[in-house]
Amino acid sequence: MHIMEGFLPSPWWQFWALLAVVCVLAGMAALIRLVKRNPESLPLLGLAGACVFILSSLKLPSVGSSSHATGTGFGAILFGPAVCSVFCTIVLVFQALLLAHGGITTLGANIISMGVAGPLAACIIFKIGHLIRPEFSIRSFSVTVFCAAAAADLVTYMMTSLQLALAYPAAEGGVLASFVVYLGIFSITQVPLAVLEGILIVLMMRFVIRIRPDIFVSLDILSKKETRILLPSSDQNLSPISKNKWIIAGIIVVLLTASLAFLLAGLGLQSGSDDLVAETLIDLGNLPVFDPLNLVSEDMHGWLFALQAGIGAAVLVFCLYLLRIRSASRGFGKKPHTIFDEHILDDVAIASPLRQVSAWLKLLFCLSAIIIGVTSPLPYLPLFIAGVMIFAALIIAKVSPRLYGSLLTIPLVFAGTGAAVILLITGGGETLIDFFRIGAFHFQITTTSLELAALVLSRTLAGMCSLYFLTLTTPITSLFSVLQKMRMPQAFIDLSMLIYRYIFVFIGEAIAIHNAQIMRGGYGTWKNYLTSFSMLASMLFIRTWEKGEAIFVSMDSRCYDGCMALPEEEGHVTPLSAMAVFLFIALIFGLLCAEMLLL
């Protein structure tokens, strides 16, 4: 979902930024009202933000972006979409600065998709499901929570697909065709992730209700009567899933998927619906449904769609079963991979020789490079900016080349995937290589698409290198001081500090619980894996909730007056550093003006 730095051209990144500012300002007003009415909710908000940070850091490559669980459904159900947009903004900023996920110019677009569209969909579905249920029970509550959590995930990626389609419409079919392509590529990973996230959040909700039902009562999500209805059902044990049930479930999934694909293919053969053929991009590894030799009749296309989708569903179920077998047979000689292996770049920034340089100066240096880089109409200036940033990071900031190269690998994979799609579907200009046509889509490389793909790739490289320089040289605590000097609302700064604190509380507690579960065989089977992981997430919620209450009590006992103490920034500005920054900005601005004049 994180659209990477430099991927959105003008004026789209400005449009989404302005729209995000309006939404976040409304959310901040709601946050201030919530904190004034219920001050005890601030630690819980920090907890929800940290939960979103952890879940949304589990990423898989996708076109110009990344696929991952969002975690926003949980926070949206608890606090509503307005407040959710605020802590999602904080999380996205932290991920850009701590992990270099996303970007600065694309921050507005990411906020709209992850912090506004997804939570809004989750809240609407949860409210509707809560109203239309025939009777309140653990089953109806679980179905409502599952639908809300899965919808938050899927709507987020639908909005991201729309943002990319508006920025890069297809040569044939325009925005709608491009939207279908992007959505199809996202769906490779996102549909299974949405289902898994929905199941995980349902298990978390049920576990929290069993341990701390007062949380839902205090937040006016459930009444005391409703929590009493849920409590007996929450304690029932689930029967184990046998091999035969796996086979039956797999057959049902394959039949349903194949039937749906056959139905969509049949609709796609009708007049005016040819764009539905783009569903073949859901699985890029299978044979595309086109027949240049006319060996397959048009009537067979629907069956081929069904066969392809059925094979894909069968492979998915079989892989899940193999994962179950592998988990059961895995020994303890090798350290298992966990979600907490992500390297927090803030550690590198604390040890950086440029740490003492003013955060204001580094912000000016990087933001100017990012904005000028994404504004450049030619790829040469962004490549020059990327080279300067790489030199500054490796030579001046003394960042390890191996670390820097590993950090750039994943963004370059994302950018390369997006550039490849732009290269093949944009069209325009003289045709260089003509590949094939699938329905309304003509896959070819033209002079215009080649220039646009090179420009997007160079802009992304410049933006990511600039963002990495800021991330690797500026601790997040220095940015808190900058926010305070910018006269940001104190509730926003306090919430940012709490989320930052809870991130490390989450990681520490999660590692301890995860290691204890491994020693007790908690991840021996696929069923135990899912159960243990959901219990881990729920226990993290409970423990951090309790720590949040303890923090609030300790703050109150120390005369907390609504303003957390923040140390002054120790950075300084030397004449040499200031001169170097301003000369660099003047140089790239002059080169930008020269490019504009040449065009």
Curated annotation (Swiss-Prot):
Query: What cellular component terms from Gene Ontology apply here?
Result: ATP-binding cassette (ABC) transporter complex
Output the superkingdom of the source species: Archaea
The entry's keywords: Cell membrane, Cobalamin biosynthesis, Cobalt, Cobalt transport, Ion transport, Membrane, Transmembrane, Transmembrane helix, Transport
Per its record, how is this protein called by name? Putative fused cobalt transport protein CbiMQ
Role played: Part of the energy-coupling factor (ECF) transporter complex CbiMNOQ involved in cobalt import.
For membrane topology, the record states: Multi-pass membrane protein
> NCBIfam families, alphabetically?
cbiM, ECF_T_CbiQ, PRK08319.1
Q: In which pathway does it act?
A: Cofactor biosynthesis; adenosylcobalamin biosynthesis
Q: Which family does the record assign?
A: In the N-terminal section; belongs to the CbiM family.
Which residue spans traverse the membrane? 12-32, 44-64, 74-94, 106-126, 140-160, 162-182, 183-203, 247-267, 303-323, 356-376, 377-397, 407-427, 438-458, 463-483, 493-513, 579-599
The GO annotation for biological process reads: cobalamin biosynthetic process
Which coarse location class describes where this protein primarily resides? Answer: membrane
- Residue ranges for the region (CbiM) are 1-239
From the Swiss-Prot or TrEMBL record, what is one GO molecular function term?
Answer: cobalt ion transmembrane transporter activity
The subunit field of the Swiss-Prot or TrEMBL record says: Forms an energy-coupling factor (ECF) transporter complex composed of an ATP-binding protein (A component, CbiO), a transmembrane protein (T component, CbiQ) and 2 possible substrate-capture proteins (S components, CbiM and CbiN) of unknown stoichimetry.
Q: Cite the residue spans of the region called CbiQ.
A: 341-599
Top-level taxonomy:
Archaea, Methanobacteriati, Methanobacteriota, Stenosarchaea group, Methanomicrobia
